[in-house]
Every structure is written in C-alpha cells, then in structure tokens.
Amino acid sequence: MSSLTNPTTVMEEEEVPVAAPIRRGNKNPRRYSLVHQASCETQHHIGIRRQNTIQHRKQLTDQMREQKILQQLNDEGVEVIFAANDVSSIDFSVIVTSTDYISTFVSDILYNMKSAGVQICHVETRESKAVSGHDVLLDCRATKNQLIKAAELLTQNHVALTHFSIFSKKSVEKSQSMIWFPRHISELDQCSKCITKYEPTTDPRHPGHGDDEYIARRKFLNDQALEFKFGDEIGYVEYTEDEHATWKAVYEKLGGLHESHTCSVYRQNLKILQKEKVLTADRIPQIRDVNKFLQKKTGFELRPCSGLLSARDFLASLAFRVFQTTTYLRHHKSPHHSPEPDLIHELLGHVPMFSDPLLAQMSQDIGLMSLGASDEHIEKLATVYWFIVEFGLCKEDGKLKAIGAGLLSAYGELIHACSDAPEHKDFDPAVTAIQKYEDDDYQPLYFVADSIHDALAKLRKYASSMDRPFSVVYDPFTKSIETIQSSADLEKAFSRLSNDLSAITHAADRMKISITA
C-alpha cells in the first residue's frame, strides 16, 4: 500500500518526455496521499470529540445547579468533570479570571475551594491579558462532586468572575495511553481496514470505469486480500496476459531511467532481484517469492491488502517490518501512472528499497514512532514518510537521484523531480513534518537527503523530540512490541542488549588474537 489514490483525470505519463509545468488551483488532486488521509482522520476525530463534548455539556446541565459556570467553562473542563467520579480524587489545574481586587479574589477562591473540600496544592497570580483584572492559576485535587461544588460556589459568591477553565494535568499522557496499537504482528489483522477513495465502479475518471472485466478482476483480487489473516500462506495469483503486458510495459519504460535518475542503492538491489529472477520483465512476480527474498535481506515482508489504509494502521504495520501491499494492477489504458496504490508501484518502487538495511530501518523507525502517537503526530509522521520514503531524493556525484518509491515507479514524475523545474530543499524531519503537501500536478517541492544514512540519523534525532509518555522497542524474536515506562522495562531491554554486545565483544577479541598471532 503506497498511499497513492487520486480522483482526477489520469495523465498518460509516457507521453511526457520532459518535466511538466506545475498547475495550481485544481480542486481534484492527482492522488489522495497518505498525508491527505492522515489530515482527514485528524479532522474526523476532532469532529467526534467536539460532538462528544457538546453531548457531555448537555448532560452536565442536569448535575449542576449553577448554569453560569457551564457557559464559562472550557471544553477540556467539561471533559475533566464528566470523566471524574465521586470515589477517587483527580489532579487538575484551574485558571480563573476576575476584575475584582486581587486580594479579594484570592480570598474568595481559597474560602470557596476549602468549603467544597478541594485540596489546593499550588497558587500563582498574574495580570490578565484578556481583561482589566487578574488571573489565578491553581493546581488542585478533588472528587467530581467537590469540583462541581467549588465551581458553583465560586460562581455564585464572586460576581466579578469573568473566566473559568479547568485542565487535566495529565491529559496528554492519559489520551496517548488510551490509544490502541498492535503489540504483536498477529494484531495487524486489526489494521487492515481499507479506506476507499477511487474506484472504477463509482468514479468515471478512473481509467477502468466501464470496463466490467477489469472491475470484476479487481474485486476478485481485493476479496482475496481481505480474507488474508496472520499465519495464512499467501496464495498464488494467476495473472492474465494483459496484466503481464502492463507490467512489462512499465518495467521496460522505467529501465531507461535507472542509470540516470535512480540512486545507487536502488540500482544495486534491482540488479540482485533481477539476477535471482525475483523481478523479471516478462512475468509479474508472486508476493510470496518476493517475501522470501526480502526476509533474507532485511526481514521485511509484504502483506496483501485491498487498497489505501488509514495512516495510523499503515504506519503501525511498518513497525513490524510489514508493508501492506495491493495485489491488483493499474488499468492497461494508463500503464505509466498509478493514481492509487497498485502492485507495480509496490514491486518496482518499494521492494528494491526495502532490500536496503538502512531504508528498511528508517521505515521501521517511522512505524515505531507512530505507535500510540497523537493524531497530530500521526499527521506529521505521515508527511515525513510521504516526502522521503515515497518522494524523496538524494545527492550522488552532484546529481539528484530518486530514493522514493512513488518516483521510482512513475516515469513522468521521476523525470520532473530530478529536473530544475521544482524546488528542492534539504531534508529536515522537523521542517518536512509541517510542510503542506501539494499535488495539483507534479509536486512543486521535493526534499533531498545527503544519503539514506543521513536521513536515518536526522529521523532518529527528530524522534527524540516527540512527546510520548513511553518508548517502544521491537523484539524481532517474538515479533512483538515492548513498551518502556518503568525501570523494570528498561532493565529487561538492557539485558537483551547486553547479550548482543557480549557476542560482539567476543568476536572482536577473537579478531585481535588473529591479528597479533
């Protein structure tokens, strides 16, 4: 699954011998990217949370006698009160604002909070920037009823109160700890929900629209992919002669650009794949045969899926060195451009690069960084992935060469990306993560790494800046994820590392003996 989906008129890229001009203002992008999908998911979740808060605010009206407080209370405050209970106390912060004298204001706060049974742990005051008055910040501990009573008393007894906000002291940690993510490779069965964007059955702009034979074939392959579960043997697919012909056309067309436009890592691994007859021009390779090769090289494997997944599910799969892969091919009418994920893109774009240990590690690192991450961080990681793993460039011998699979499998855009037409920026994950993605036509901007090693080093530095209440480690022996939150977790991780270092140290000592002998 390369995250390429597009509802626009398909471009015949084989007819574009030079870089195409960049057009702006097109409401229908050439492809719905992983970036677009992550953004949509973020907005969807924001909408759900907003609707929940509205509902919770309505429900709290029945529990609170003083309605004025609900009018002033912030959305997070509504959720803090709603989630609290009358048995255990919670820690929270309060910011209240008043136009009264500060001494009177603080006195009223302390009196009413104490009357309600609220424990005050910390108090700060400052001049208010919003009104002519003062803000008071309090760190508190209370039960739900105590919190509601304190809010009602203060609202009733301090008429100059203009603002009342409540914040959970551990809202970020709590929300992230509640985000589910797979802990074992078998749980990727729960990360295979396809997000349909661009189908020949519904979109007249799809090259296969109206082609009943192509539609039926695509459905057959997608249905097979949907049935796949962890532990199943990947089935043998009997591809048609038309599909083999489409594969061959793309394979041979791109071959003319390999030496001039692709990075040395890609060329080296492609030659090995060709030498071992994993990839040949005449026949579409079987996924299970490709997996045998990848497992020996980097431990990566392809898993059948039926199309574009959610950004969170797709990135989570990478954490286990699993790449979710479509099994259908683009329509034969448009062989040199795929506006959606298809098998040609996966095999010719991703497989040679996943054969490289550094690129494989970088992909897995992005996946590990995504586990339990907030929607905001998922969107940033999807953007980083898109701009470097899908459409990244590197410098070799003073020339721009493609490392991104989206470029390596698209003839016209490969030429465009390496030309002087678009803007090129040095790859910096912190900058890349917030770069707006545009794809009205060919992209106007590409990021360039000095090397794959350089990109990996920068990515790991960026990972250290991510705010997550836990760390994760992948155990390749059990194919599972371990979370590190305590010293006991850390000790377990160090124990495994110590065993590896012991073997390396022993090997180094043996080499010293051989050299001196």
UniProtKB/Swiss-Prot annotation:
An annotated GO BP: dopamine biosynthetic process from tyrosine
Highest taxon listed in the record's lineage: Eukaryota
Gene Ontology MF term list: iron ion binding; tyrosine 3-monooxygenase activity
Regulation: Phosphorylation leads to an increase in the catalytic activity.
GO cellular component, one term: axon
Cofactor: Fe(2+)
Recorded metabolic or biological pathway in which this protein acts: Catecholamine biosynthesis; dopamine biosynthesis; dopamine from L-tyrosine: step 1/2
Places the protein is found: Cytoplasm, Perinuclear region; Cell projection, Axon
Phosphoserine, modified sites: 33
Keywords: Behavior, Catecholamine biosynthesis, Cell projection, Cytoplasm, Iron, Metal-binding, Monooxygenase, Neurotransmitter biosynthesis, Oxidoreductase, Phosphoprotein
Enzyme Commission code: 1.14.16.2
Pfam families noted in UniProt: Biopterin_H
Tagged with keyword Phosphoprotein: yes
Chain residues that bind Fe cation: 345, 350, 390
Catalytic activity: (6R)-L-erythro-5,6,7,8-tetrahydrobiopterin + L-tyrosine + O2 = (4aS,6R)-4a-hydroxy-L-erythro-5,6,7,8-tetrahydrobiopterin + L-dopa
UniProt cross-references to PANTHER family, sorted A to Z: AROMATIC AMINO ACID HYDROXYLASE, TYROSINE 3-MONOOXYGENASE
Role description: Involved in the synthesis of catecholamines, such as dopamine. Has a role in serotonin signaling. Required for normal explorative and foraging behavior.
Similarity comment: Belongs to the biopterin-dependent aromatic amino acid hydroxylase family.
Protein name: Tyrosine 3-monooxygenase
Source organism of this protein record: Caenorhabditis briggsae
Gene name, Swiss-Prot/TrEMBL: cat-2
